[in-house]
């Protein structure tokens, strides 16, 4: 073989290798089923520069103008405090991914995401991921998307299962030192889909005395709930455990091949919305933080409730937190002085017609004690009281006697016919 032929063969081989490399780059999922990606794609460059200080200026280029309007309208005091907060989201699936997106759009300071699953095409009916992210870890794909949504948010991701011993210790450490100031974080949001992970979050938060919120959606996708959990003050997840947890059943044995839980993006969004709204109220101290909110999509029923801690809870840290909370309440000073606000007298400058407002909720002394007209009504006349001491006028007495005589006569005739 001549040198010229060898050069042509090498050239053709190089071209084939280059074409093969381009195909792998364009279609990374078309590799063998046993191969695993050795690296994650880099995060996309943010579309704008970071904003150092929030502004209430109403311009199209200000992504925070609508949020700062809450402060201008008196709903929230100092909305910019949200940039100081750190929230951990455990589970970035149907609820967790939407929660992370909402908090990112709200301008949260830092998000810490925990999940060990990968994005699948089957997830596209309910998650905010895109089909081209299939095969990537959920936390990495979420970070790439969220950074593009709001580059001001600091996002930390952990691609592991928190229920293993080593990973659980890391999870506890991030609760303890994961904030923007390397201190304790502000809140943990549980958005997982299994009881084992919920128990792990519950154990960690009881151990660290960390306030957290739990959420879930039913397997039939038409109901869900959120729950605010403050160790010692409210019931933890182990205080009122589900039947599967209380019975000690391995929930993995309950799953059947070929059978999956139903999933609706509407239910996921409703539960995520409730969870984020409760989170904002807690972090920014406005409104009322709900302890428990349920959701039934079939009847649009939203029950609210509060659950007290169980004094016989199996979690030793929960019992310790209950004791600490009881001591805290007992040591609080009792304020016996109750200030009664003075009623302000409304003064009208002009009252041309002499109109006066009266309280009609209680009957006046002039009204009958036996009859009550009700709120907003009054008698047209006062009913005459009839008793033994009532004196009748001559006309009334004559009428009374006449009616009595007729009655007596009818009775007498009836008796005669009976004989």
Curated annotation (Swiss-Prot):
Tissue expression per record: Expressed in the intestine.
One Pfam family here: ThiF
Active site: 260
Start and end residues of each stretch annotated as Disordered: 18-47
Any one Gene Ontology cellular component term annotated for this protein: cytosol
Binding-site residues for Zn(2+), renumbered to this chain: 236, 239, 313, 318
Keyword terms of this UniProt record: ATP-binding, Metal-binding, Nucleotide-binding, Ubl conjugation pathway, Zinc
Disruption of the gene: reported phenotype: Reduced egg laying and lifespan. Delayed larval development. Enhanced resistance to pathogens, heat and oxidative stress. Reduced survival in the presence of cadmium. Inactivation of the ufm-1 cascade.
InterPro entries assigned: D-isomer_DH_CS1, ThiF/MoeB/HesA, ThiF_NAD_FAD-bd, Ubiquitin-activating_enz
Residue spans of biased composition, Polar residues class: 30-41
Signal peptide (from-to): none
Chain sites annotated for binding ATP: 94, 115, 138, 161, 194
A GO MF term: metal ion binding
A biological-process GO annotation: response to endoplasmic reticulum stress
Function recorded in the entry: E1-like enzyme which activates ufm-1. Required for interaction between ufm-1 and ufc-1.
Subunit annotation: Interacts with ufc-1.
Family statement: Belongs to the ubiquitin-activating E1 family. UBA5 subfamily.
Name of the protein in its database record: Ubiquitin-like modifier-activating enzyme 5
Organism: Caenorhabditis elegans
Gene this chain is encoded by: uba-5
């Amino acid at each position: 073989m001549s040198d010229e032929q060898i050069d042509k063969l090498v050239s053709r081989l190089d071209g084939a290798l280059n074409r093969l490399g381009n195909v792998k780059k364009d279609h990374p999922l078309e590799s063998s089923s046993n191969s695993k990606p050795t690296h994650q794609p880099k995060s996309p460059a943010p579309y704008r520069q970071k904003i150092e200080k929030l502004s209430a200026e109403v311009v199209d280029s200000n992504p925070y103008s609508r949020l700062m309007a809450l402060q201008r309208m008196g709903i929230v005091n100092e909305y910019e405090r949200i940039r100081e907060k750190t929230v951990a989201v455990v589970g970035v699936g149907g609820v967790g991914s939407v929660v992370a997106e909402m908090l990112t759009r709200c301008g949260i300071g830092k998000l810490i995401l925990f999940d060990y699953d990968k994005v699948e095409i089957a997830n596209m009916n309910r998650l905010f991921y895109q089909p081209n992210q299939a095969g990537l870890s959920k936390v990495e794909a979420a970070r790439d998307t969220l950074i593009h949504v709001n580059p001001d948010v600091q996002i930390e991701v952990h691609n592991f299962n928190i229920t293993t011993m080593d990973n659980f210790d890391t999870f506890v450490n991030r609760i303890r030192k994961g904030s923007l100031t390397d201190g304790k974080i502000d809140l943990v949001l549980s958005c997982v889909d299994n009881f084992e992970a919920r128990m792990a979050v519950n154990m960690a938060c009881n151990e660290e005395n960390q306030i957290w919120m739990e959420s879930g959606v039913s397997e039939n996708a038409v109901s869900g709930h959120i729950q605010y959990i403050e160790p010692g003050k409210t019931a933890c997840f182990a205080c009122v455990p589900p039947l599967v947890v209380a019975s000690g059943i391995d929930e993995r044995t309950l799953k059947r091949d070929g059978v999956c839980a139903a999933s609706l993006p509407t239910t996921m969004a409703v539960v995520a919305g409730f969870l984020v709204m409760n989170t904002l109220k807690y972090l920014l101290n406005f409104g009322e933080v709900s302890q428990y909110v349920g959701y039934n999509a079939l009847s649009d029923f939203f029950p609210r409730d509060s659950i007290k801690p169980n004094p016989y809870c199996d979690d030793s840290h929960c019992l310790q937190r209950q004791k600490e909370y009881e001591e805290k309440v007992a040591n609080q000073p009792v304020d016996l002085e109750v200030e009664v606000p003075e009623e302000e007298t409304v003064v009208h400058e002009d009252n041309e017609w002499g109109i006066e407002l009266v309280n009609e909720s209680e009957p006046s002394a002039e009204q009958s004690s036996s009859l009550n007209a009700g709120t907003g009504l009054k008698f047209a006349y006062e009913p005459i009281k009839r008793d033994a001491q009532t004196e009748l006028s001559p006309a009334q007495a004559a009428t009374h006697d006449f009616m009595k005589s007729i009655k007596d006569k009818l009775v007498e005739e009836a008796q005669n016919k009976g004989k």
